[in-house]
A protein has these predicted regions:
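Bacterial N-terminal signal peptides that target proteins for export
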Residues: 2-12
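Bacterial N-terminal signal peptides
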Residues: 10-20
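Sequence/structural signature of beta-propeller modules
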Residues: 12, 24-75, 79, 85-101
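Structural signature of eukaryotic scaffold interfaces centered on beta-propeller domains
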Residues: 36-58, 98-136, 175-179
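Structural hallmark of WD40 beta-propellers
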Residues: 60-63, 137-141
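Beta-propeller domains
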Residues: 66-110, 142-167
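Long, well-ordered hydrophobic secondary-structure segments characteristic of membrane-embedded
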Residues: 131-132, 140-144
């Protein structure tokens, strides 16, 4: 038992020293060294710096991208292109609890058509709410291309609040437009 413990401690110490040496070698590298090692130009560095957002800082803009047949919306930051959130809309999402509590089940049931439960969608063409023709960022609307429905997402908490069925159409390939 003691021999095994000594071997384990020795291995951990050697690993620690190896990591420390490697970290020191990379941290001593200058910007010019990195540019040379990776064959980067000044233009490459400028392009990278235009999209870089340090940890803890916020992106200047957010984009709302339709998730297509996932029935979701993907929110990502610009310029970093980091995925900020997946918004559950027409499809239950077990990993975030959407469609598994009474509140979100009730929202999904609003999208039932002729009493038939439809727990899937094809999200396309999001639109942001406007006041006097200017974006106000209060709500996001998104079309379900496979079924005649539209969803309303509250941008204060990024949750789907309402699914509105269009009783006239059977399906639509339209989009959400705010007027």
């Amino acid at each position: 038992m003691k021999i095994r413990m000594k071997q384990t401690v020795s291995m951990l110490l050697l690993t620690g020293f190896g990591l420390a040496a490697a970290t020191e070698a990379f941290s001593a590298e200058s910007l010019q060294d990195v540019m040379k090692r990776r064959n980067l130009s000044q233009q490459d560095l400028l392009a990278a710096s235009k999209t870089y957002v340090p940890t803890g800082k916020r992106d200047e803009f957010m984009a709302f991208s339709s998730g297509g047949q996932s029935g979701q919306i993907i929110v990502y930051g610009i310029p970093s292109m980091r995925i900020l959130k997946y918004l559950a809309v027409f499809t239950p999402e077990p990993w975030q609890g959407y469609g598994f509590d009474e509140e979100s089940k009730a929202v999904l049931r609003q999208g039932n058509i002729d009493g038939k439960e439809i727990n899937w969608g094809d999200t396309h063409h999001p639109a942001i709410s406007e006041t006097d023709g200017k974006y106000d960022g209060q709500f996001l609307f998104i079309n379900d291309k496979a079924n005649p429905r539209l969803a309303v997402i509250d941008l204060r908490d990024f949750e789907t609040k309402q699914i509105v069925v269009n009783p006239i159409f059977k399906s639509e390939h339209g989009g959400a437009f705010v007027t």
